[in-house]
Amino acid sequence: TPKYLNSPESSIFEKGKLLFAFDKAYKSIREEKQAILVEGYMDVISAHNHGVTNVVASLGTAYTRDHGHILMRQAEEIVLAYDMDGAGRQAAARAIELLQNTDFKVRVLAMPDGKDPDDYVRNHGGQAFKELVAKAVKPLDYLLSESLIKHDTNDTEGKQAVMADVFPYIANIDSQTQRDDALKTLALPLWLDNSTIFRYFRDYVKKGQIELVD
């Protein structure tokens, strides 16, 4: 059973061009210069009921560039607070991709214990949720932590898998300085020196694949 049921799309109702509760949230978003983007209606309703009013939802669909256009005049920062199930993780990864190299500051909130924002707010309250949002991390840190959970970096295959997960994001960073900094960040948990990670990255950009030597 789908978690969120929406009306069929039409010329009037286009999910990719609407943000649930934006009419109620935009003043808070403007004041705080931050929009918290969640997946579902109940996430928004619970947050607003507990005093966190800069929260909007993408109506059960992934983030789109049209959503960004809606938020552009109100927010400087977008915090992604999607569910931590498979669909939520995929939606977060897609949103990170679309938000990369935009004017928004972007952070990602990994909900603890697999809970969604609705569960968390109802159990812990609005202030606790705000404190959690304050700890949201940069997209690179989120993608890296997600990958490190899945792969054992003590062996070559694990290192290669982590690089395969994170290199596409780094390759799309416009700034050379930021790209170099991202590679240095990636090198640390892989126990690689900077020159090695740079070489693997150059090979990835040139060949589209990663070839590691034990």
Walk through the language-model features, giving the residues of each:
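A charged alpha-helical hairpin associated with nucleic-acid processing machineries
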Residues: 26-35, 62-78, 82-214
